[in-house]
């Protein structure tokens, strides 16, 4: 054992003998940083809403919905609707449009119940069908991103419905119908253009027409419902 320990000590001395004359000059600064950056942790803390007041959370969500409304009214190639998707805005627009379509001649006997259900089902079922068609054609966006865009782009038609109701309160003449026709046509084109501006780039170039055509039909059906609405006389 003593011989083994002596052999080990001599081997260690020979191994580190060459390092005994190595020195670091005082003129050469030794630089470096051994601290671990905490940027990712701070970002996660900023995004956490566990300690955030409910009022701040609601105001932030309302601001996000308002920003998406602006993107629809001024459509351009942007990823805001796709990146920060939500279904609160589409739900509000769908309910608002269905409520404004109540009270027409077609559903006066039923007190507007079926009309509300028709609008609600047409909008959401149509959006789901368009989304599935987009995915089957090779679209690159997710299911809920497509629903978000299609739902938010109902905003122009909701505005058209509001204008049509105001016009019908004034008169039921041919001139009022022409005004409603112009408003609905413009808003229909606006909704179609806005939705395709967000969704067209997510489709393969040779299949974009197949993806845009159902969107055209979707907003055309909603526009027809808005145009043919007539209050109870």
From Swiss-Prot:
Keyword Mitochondrion included in the entry's annotation: no
Q: Please give the residue ranges for the topological domain Lumenal.
A: 106-111, 164-180, 230-233
Q: Which InterPro entries match?
A: Yip1/4-like, Yip1_dom
Q: Which UniProt keywords apply?
A: Golgi apparatus, Membrane, Transmembrane, Transmembrane helix
- What GO CC terms are in its UniProt record? Golgi medial cisterna; Golgi membrane; Golgi trans cisterna; trans-Golgi network
Gene that specifies this protein:
yipf6
Is Aminoacyl-tRNA synthetase there in the keyword field? no
Per its record, how is this protein called by name?
A: Protein YIPF6
- What is stated as this protein's family in its record? Belongs to the YIP1 family.
* Location (main, coarse): Golgi
Q: Name one GO biological process term.
A: endoplasmic reticulum to Golgi vesicle-mediated transport
This protein's source sits in the domain of life called Eukaryota
Which parts of the chain does the record assign to the membrane side Cytoplasmic? 1-84, 133-142, 202-208
Chain segments annotated as coiled-coil in the UniProt record: none
Q: Which Pfam families match?
A: Yip1
**Where is it localised?**
Golgi apparatus membrane
Q: Where are the transmembrane segments?
A: 85-105, 112-132, 143-163, 181-201, 209-229
Protein topology in the membrane: Multi-pass membrane protein
């Amino acid at each position: 054992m003593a011989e083994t320990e002596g052999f080990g000590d001599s081997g260690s001395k020979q191994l580190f003998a060459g390092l005994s004359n190595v020195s670091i000059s005082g003129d050469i600064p030794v630089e470096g940083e051994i601290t671990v950056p905490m940027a990712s942790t701070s970002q996660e803390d900023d995004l956490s809403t566990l300690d955030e007041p409910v009022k701040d959370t609601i105001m932030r969500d309302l601001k996000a919905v308002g920003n998406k409304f602006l993107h629809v009214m001024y459509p351009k190639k942007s990823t805001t609707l796709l990146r920060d998707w939500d279904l609160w805005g589409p739900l509000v627009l769908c309910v608002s449009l269905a409520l404004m379509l109540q009270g027409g001649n077609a559903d006066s006997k039923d007190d507007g119940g079926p009309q509300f259900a028709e609008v609600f089902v047409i909008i959401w079922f149509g959006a789901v069908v368009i989304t599935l068609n987009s995915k089957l054609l090779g679209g690159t966006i997710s299911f809920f991103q497509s629903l978000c865009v299609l739902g938010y782009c109902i905003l122009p038609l909701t505005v058209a419905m509001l204008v049509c109701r105001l016009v019908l309160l004034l008169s039921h003449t041919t001139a009022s119908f022409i005004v409603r026709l112009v408003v609905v046509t413009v808003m229909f084109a606006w909704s179609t253009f806005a939705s395709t501006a967000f969704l067209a780039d997510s489709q393969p170039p040779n299949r974009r027409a197949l993806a845009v055509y159902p969107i055209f039909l979707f907003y055309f059906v909603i526009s027809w419902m808005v145009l043919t609405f007539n209050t109870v006389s």
